[in-house]
């Protein structure tokens, strides 16, 4: 280390001297010599080879020639040429001004020459150089001209230009090795942006040439207020130039050489060799052409000499700083060296103006189509009015206009529906609510606010990006972390789907149920049976049953009707002649009661006592008592009209009045009339037994007295706005009070049950030291293993809280229930004749339902019932009994079923409550449209096949037609997708992302085909749940679709219907959809608006439809259903051809033909009507003959007379025996 104490240019950090100062950073000032740099011209150095004399000679010759050329003005000159000429004049003045400036170009060669690659040493001869310059001068004198040559010649010219450029560049490179620096640095200015504004030229205002001014300014550091023009560079020049490249003169090339660095952005250069510009401390990073250097190279020396030591030290510091800047730059550019970092305001302004001119307003395909429609309509109006006349025919007319199909609509009604035949005695529709303006009805329409909030939170939580999970990310893929798929129980080992897996209860019911209440623990099963109220009147009941074929039994909930009646009949010997059947309105009730009775009889479930529900038959050859749903018994009556293998049938919970129950009443009334040995027992928990007795012909009514345990009923003081929140609070209050016993909460539907269960669990987690509570939901769609959990005993010290729909109202005895919380609402299926669809809606319950629910609390001990409505509402706002399902639902399937059972005249069928006339006529009209009924109201072969499918008639028709069209595989998937609720979901906050992903599945012609595409994509992804979540699809709904498809496929196999695929020809699928929904067709009216073809009612495409916002709107569409919200929205829309509608729906539509007149159309319509009238007359004649034959066969009506054959009895038509007196016969 040298002594640096004397050097003031060294920045030094001194240590702390405690005597003189506390500490800090001391920066010594620079010397005056380092503050002010003095630039000195280097001494002239003669060339050893005499090159300086040769260079000055050539320079003088060129200047003389240039002076002569300046006198001749070019026809076209540019601003750049003028600028360069100014630069040349200033150069000339400077060269004449001082002696040091004469050798400036010679002094510019600071760097030592590198070792060149050996090449051709020469350049071109002086003669060729002179000829070339002369040719350029002559060409420039002619000015700029426009060529009208052909494109082919222009391309040749262009290729010659490129060849010439290439040769010229090569010659310049060769020549530059032995020429001056100015010639070696040259290159033509290139630009690729022809129509755009030029990049700004950064020129020093006070500089004559790039060799002066800014490079001689004093060092201003980073904070200098005066910035060099290099610090705001222009965009990097590109390679190409316009067609004038080779037409530039030698002078122009030289000028471009001189002006290049003042116009173009210099690039960064590493300082591995000495660059004198590196001591400029503004860190520009670009190498200027010329500089008047500080140091000078002495003759014969390789190093650099400095005048003072300060200069040397400054130069070394700057070199180190330049090297440091070079290596610290990112990708060769930093904030100062980036050529794209800064631009002048003028350039930015001109660039923005240019882009603004080019900018066009974005127009969507929908808006473009709307504009075209408007323009076409306006043109058509003007032409029609005669204001303007068409002078030219538009040859670019659309082909669609030429081939557009115009449909004519007919209002054809078959003779059996024209009013001459009456089908029902109930003309007005029945509304399932007592007062639509009551508090309960309004709250039911609004729904629960808690449910709405919970739904939004759940969707948001489900759809949020889980950044903390490694699975599915790139890091997770590297580490081998994969997303775990949920196990699919429905898929067997061989990959097939078993849709019965989740519906099988027998496997979960094998275990013996343990007693949980004190009553069940202390008493044996026999003692429990004897404790029931029905045990006291056993003999009286059996006597009445023996004496009468039909008996009405009325008893309160919990009296033992369901479990004991079947056993009493079995013990009385009725099972010797056939099975005892007991119908239940719900599957869970049938399964749980069968299990209880099998335990009381000491057998296994499925042997002596069994049950049969949809998808599962748990019976055997030895079964004597069979519990089943009413739908199962209805299907059995199809195969066997008289139900011969039953000796007694118990219709349990008749007050429920389900659709199947009402149909069974009418059928069993006829069966009992034909079979005197069949016993029919109808049980009900309500007091409307007189209605049942009158229906069956004033049959006896038997009352079972008393209830097992008393129930204390508590009403709410005020109406509850949010029934879910009120139920949660009440359940927590009961639970925390410490009273023993389980809780049963009644809710309207599945979503309400799930929200209530979640809310109870959340509130309990917030409490400290809260007693344990097992929350168990139960509803019909719940898997069987979870449904069976409610019958199992909870661990000791744990209270059960069961949240259920009205599935738990009837025949469901859960041991230990002491508290019932009644929300006061239930879901009912209601038919809307206007849209022709059933809808599940929330309605207030009836008084009969309320009594049933309170009865659940007194089955195994005294209990309490909390009603979340006022006593006034119970008396004034609730109906006495629930409106029967047959009066509020679509009857199409019922009509089909009755027709298939042989009921020709529906008015003669015995309905306990006749259905409304509108519902009946709508259903029969729909069946006639679909071809299930003929013109006389008789069942067709298509209708007989439609009965087998548990589907809406239109979906059944679609499946049947698909077999003929060869696309049954695709239609089976579409029908399955339509049988489940919503497939897609839109979480709040991610609506746009959800819509974008949904658009990927969209098939522009059809929403039905979009559903098909979704299922096929899910299948291709191995039925993945993760794939569903990523694409905002309900995985549970997709699994349900797969189960429905498997079930329908089994039915098709049983009916010997072929399963075929149409491949990628999905037009056949659209035609098949049209065959089932042509009666729900709409045509385009105006812009984006449709109207129903038959009714003229306006319809709108739903925003989620694949056809919504499409550039082309089809003329005709069919839709699956109408949804009434803010507008009449069509859901599940498919574009169809007008000719398909006329072909598949001839009763409504026909194609308008130019050749046919109105008279011909009227004549054809009259012929069709007369043909139908003839058919109807023939059918009426046949019906009359059949009725007369029936009357002859049974003169006493429906009741069959019993004949006792005795000795001496003479039949009609037999000759009398002569030995016997005519008066003596009989006993």
Swiss-Prot record:
UniProt cross-link Glycyl lysine isopeptide (Lys-Gly) (interchain with G-Cter in SUMO2), position:
482-483, 504, 1166
Modified positions (Phosphothreonine) in chain numbering: 117
Catalytic activity field: ATP + H2O = ADP + phosphate + H(+)
Residues bearing PTM Phosphoserine:
56, 199, 224, 1194
Q: List, for all copies, the residue spans of the domain called Helicase ATP-binding.
A: 542-705
State the Gene Ontology terms under molecular function.
Answer: 3'-5' RNA helicase activity; ATP binding; ATP hydrolysis activity; RNA binding; RNA helicase activity
A GO term (biological process) for this protein? mRNA splicing, via spliceosome
Q: What InterPro entries is this protein classified in?
A: DEAD-box_helicase_OB_fold, DEAD/DEAH_box_helicase_dom, DNA/RNA_helicase_DEAH_CS, HA2_WH, Helicase-assoc_dom, Helicase_ATP-bd, Helicase_C-like, P-loop_NTPase
* Bias (Acidic residues) ranges: 300-310
All copies of domain Helicase C-terminal, residue ranges: 727-902
Give a GO cellular-component term: spliceosomal complex
Q: Motif DEAH box: which residue numbers?
A: 652-655
For the modification N6-acetyllysine, the affected residues are 260
List each coiled-coil range.
none
Q: In which compartments does the protein localize?
A: Nucleus
Question: Where does this protein hold ATP?
Answer: 555-562
Task: Mark the residues carrying the PTM N-acetylglycine.
Answer: 2
Q: What is its EC number?
A: 3.6.4.13
Main location per UniProt? nucleus
For region Disordered, the annotated ranges are 60-320, 1155-1227
Quaternary data: Identified in the spliceosome C complex.
| Record-linked PANTHER family | ATP-DEPENDENT RNA HELICASE, PRE-MRNA-SPLICING FACTOR ATP-DEPENDENT RNA HELICASE PRP16
Which family is this sequence assigned to? Belongs to the DEAD box helicase family. DEAH subfamily. PRP16 sub-subfamily.
> So what does this one do?
Probable ATP-binding RNA helicase. Involved in pre-mRNA splicing as component of the spliceosome.
The associated disease is:
Retinitis pigmentosa 84: A form of retinitis pigmentosa, a retinal dystrophy belonging to the group of pigmentary retinopathies. Retinitis pigmentosa is characterized by retinal pigment deposits visible on fundus examination and primary loss of rod photoreceptor cells followed by secondary loss of cone photoreceptors. Patients typically have night vision blindness and loss of midperipheral visual field. As their condition progresses, they lose their far peripheral visual field and eventually central vision as well.
Q: Please identify the protein, giving its name as recorded.
A: Pre-mRNA-splicing factor ATP-dependent RNA helicase PRP16
- Source organism per UniProt: Homo sapiens (Human)
Gene of this entry: DHX38
